[in-house]
């Protein structure tokens, strides 16, 4: 295969190999210039073959995609077609780059941002190989024109009054740089003001700008003028009339039954509506005899769509009659129900070269509108199974080493079941979740532990980017159903396990806040913080009854209860690197502090690292706390949890071909104890030991994007374990590997 990159370049063309540094002239450096500069460079940017991270300036000396294209694109064999389609990249030709057109686009962009005297020129720079060329751009900006004044002209009196009342919200101010985008935004703002006050038919295009750049040097005097000729309905305020609600189970369904109220009609099929009308009315802000408001329309559409009940939602507004005096819009809301049931499966698989292997799965079904009130009923079962594939571990003669299974039932109500907050305006429909769950943890040859829990949770959202979740009551009970003599010996050797795995109640309260940046952000961020506490209100009751706060052995239903405070946080940021690659950074941390009735937090509440979504070079609970390590198979995976956790991940994701993506990653972290339990040596957190006690792993992976979910395969390789000295201290390459199969991204 020839490695020539110019063998298929047409005689009258050249291969584009990048830009030279763009030269800027005749400008004043300020914030406006820097913002415009970014837009100009985006307009002029063109990635050559083999571009490094999508750069227009730097390229790899090995443009393998172009080489493959040159070698196979002209062949008609099946293999050649597959190679070309999967790996080949056609040459980026100068004729396709079209620098003349790009210079014109950049020049128009400058003028739309106030640089009316700008000029963009280009130069084609032929390389040593005459079939290759770079492009050099020179950008001359000239004076920046600023806003002198803005007048609103020719608007009807009532509309003019609305303009005057909203002048404090105007986006155009004297002295601001001239920007077409701001002018358009101001025109849209006025349109929203009008449409939120009854002017249903008003559109931004019914007003236009006139600009005077001559009267005052380097400034623009603006007039926003209402059009002389517009449809009659545009000048009129409109009120909502009758409301018709159509509920269909399919798009083509003909409705034959109805319920009629004074201003409200529901059309459906059957003896009664498939959905209680109050569920829709609660989210419908447009009401009969009220002025039309576009914000109310948007909020209604968002909330009704957000219930998840419907696959199609459509609003239609129709004038009641055609007379010039008509000011009433009858509204028809058409809703088509989504399929009532959802069936889902989640799966993962972990393999460890030291001998642990096992799958895990969640299988569930959801029922929408379960009781005609918009409720969502969800039932799922889950399980994981792990066995020993090696022959050196204690208990390896057993075919089954451990398994876990459980079930969850939850009911989500589309409202807050609270006596207050009823008039608060939410971004999305809030919800109340009632949940019950049960799980069994079995460690073959050691114990079987049962955890049952119930919770009440409120979800609410005030803005598009922030989600709140508050659980005022979570009641959890953990108890042993079976324990072998061997595990009894382990417990006697390890007082820490004796405390953390004791039978106990865990009455909790929890609050979480989640921030997700808008979808329009090129480099989005995600941040979540979760705060929870256990038994403090219960202990206050004991305190009122005369028992000391720090006294031990207080009970709930004749069983001891746990008492602690816990905080967790999770942060990730994604940087776009080209069109099909990303760099993702992730940090998580957590702390739990036990006090009062507890010496140590329950085992299920403690932190651990390792696994498919953590430090992928190591198995779950196989690292920490601190520099603690045991070679005993009897206690490994049981006591390797901690009170304090730090974890950081860096992952680069890139497209290989089609929907198949590759990844390379670096994971670091550990857990530590905050109290000396007298058993797990070197487990306490100390700042001076932070770096050497941080586990480190790297690896590569594959992701196959099926649009609705992602299949992920990660191969992790250990670099550093906390319990040995030296940087690379893995005993052997074979023992420092883990293979994980999972669904979804790790963060």
Residue map of PLM features:
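Outer-membrane beta-barrel domain signature, especially the mid-to-C-terminal portions
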Residues: 540-542, 635-637, 677-695, 725-732, ...
């Amino acid at each position: 295969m020839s490695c020539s990159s110019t063998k298929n370049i047409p005689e009258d063309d050249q291969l584009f190999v990048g830009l030279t540094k763009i030269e800027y002239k005749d400008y004043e450096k300020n914030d406006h210039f820097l913002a415009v500069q970014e837009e100009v460079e985006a307009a002029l940017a063109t990635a050559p073959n083999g571009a490094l991270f999508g750069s227009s300036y730097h390229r790899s000396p090995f443009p393998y995609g172009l080489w493959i294209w040159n070698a196979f694109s002209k062949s008609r064999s099946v293999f050649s077609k597959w190679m070309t389609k999967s790996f080949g990249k056609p040459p980026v030709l100068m004729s396709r780059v079209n620098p003349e057109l790009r210079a014109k686009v950049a020049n128009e962009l400058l003028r739309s941002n106030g640089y009316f005297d700008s000029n963009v020129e280009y130069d084609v720079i032929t390389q040593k190989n005459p079939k290759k060329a770079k492009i050099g751009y020179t950008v001359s900006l000239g004076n920046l024109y600023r806003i002198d004044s803005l007048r609103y002209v020719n608007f009807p009196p009532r509309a003019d009054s609305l303009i005057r009342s909203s002048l404090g919200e105007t986006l155009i101010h004297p002295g601001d740089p001239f920007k077409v985008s701001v002018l358009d935004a101001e025109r849209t703002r006025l349109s929203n003001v009008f449409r939120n006050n009854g002017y249903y038919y008003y559109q931004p295009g019914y007003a236009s700008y006139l600009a005077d750049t001559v009267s005052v040097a380097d400034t623009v005097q603006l007039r926003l003028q209402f059009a002389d000729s517009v449809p009659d309905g545009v000048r009129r305020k409109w009120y909502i009339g009758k409301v018709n609600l159509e509920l269909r189970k399919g798009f083509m369904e003909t409705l034959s039954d109805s319920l009629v109220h004074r201003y409200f009609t529901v059309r459906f099929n059957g003896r009664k509506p498939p959905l209680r009308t109050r569920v829709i009315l609660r989210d419908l802000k447009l009401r009969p005899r009220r002025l039309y408001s576009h914000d109310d329309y948007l909020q209604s559409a968002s909330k009704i769509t957000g219930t998840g009940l419907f696959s199609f939602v459509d609003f239609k507004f129709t004038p009641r009659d055609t007379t010039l005096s008509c000011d009433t819009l009858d509204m028809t809301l058409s809703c088509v129900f989504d399929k009532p049931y959802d069936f889902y499966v989640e799966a993962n698989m972990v393999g460890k070269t030291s001998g642990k292997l096992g799958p895990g799965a969640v299988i569930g079904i959801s029922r929408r509108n379960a009781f005609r009130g918009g409720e969502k009923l969800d039932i799922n079962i889950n399980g994981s199974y792990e066995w020993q594939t090696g022959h050196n571990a204690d208990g390896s003669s057993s075919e089954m080493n451990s398994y876990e299974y459980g079930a969850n039932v939850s009911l989500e109500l589309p409202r807050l079941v609270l006596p207050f907050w009823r008039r608060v305006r939410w971004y999305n429909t809030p919800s109340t979740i009632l949940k019950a769950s049960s799980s069994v943890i079995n460690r073959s040859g050691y114990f079987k532990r049962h955890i049952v829990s119930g919770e009440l949770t409120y979800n609410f959202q005030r803005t598009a980017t922030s989600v709140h979740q508050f659980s005022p009551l979570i009641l959890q009970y953990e108890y042993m159903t079976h324990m072998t003599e061997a595990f009894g010996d382990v417990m006697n050797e390890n007082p820490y396990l004796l405390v953390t795995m004791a039978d106990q109640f865990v009455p909790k309260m929890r609050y979480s806040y989640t921030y997700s940046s808008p979808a329009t952000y090129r480099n989005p961020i995600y941040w979540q913080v979760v705060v929870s506490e256990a038994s403090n209100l219960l202990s206050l009751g004991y305190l009122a009854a005369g028992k000391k706060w720090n006294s031990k052995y207080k009970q709930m239903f004749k069983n001891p209860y746990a008492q602690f405070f816990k905080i967790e946080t999770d942060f990730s940021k994604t940087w776009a690197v080209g069109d099909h690659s990303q760099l993702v950074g992730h940090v998580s941390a957590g702390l739990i502090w036990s006090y009062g009735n507890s010496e140590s937090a329950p085992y299920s509440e403690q932190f651990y690292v390792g696994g498919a979504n953590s430090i992928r070079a190591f198995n779950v609970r196989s690292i920490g706390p601190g520099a603690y390590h045991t070679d005993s198979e009897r206690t490994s995976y049981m006591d390797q949890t901690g009170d304090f956790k730090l974890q950081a991940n860096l992952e680069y994701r890139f497209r290989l071909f089609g929907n198949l993506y590759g990844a390379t990653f670096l994971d670091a972290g550990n857990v530590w104890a905050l109290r000396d339990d007298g058993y797990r040596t070197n487990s306490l957190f100390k700042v001076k030991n932070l770096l050497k006690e941080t586990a480190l792993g790297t690896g590569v992976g594959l992701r196959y994007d099926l649009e609705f979910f992602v299949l992920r395969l990660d191969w992790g390789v250990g670099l550093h374990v906390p319990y040995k000295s030296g940087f690379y201290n893995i005993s052997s390459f074979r023992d420092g590997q883990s293979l994980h199969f999972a669904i979804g991204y790790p963060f």
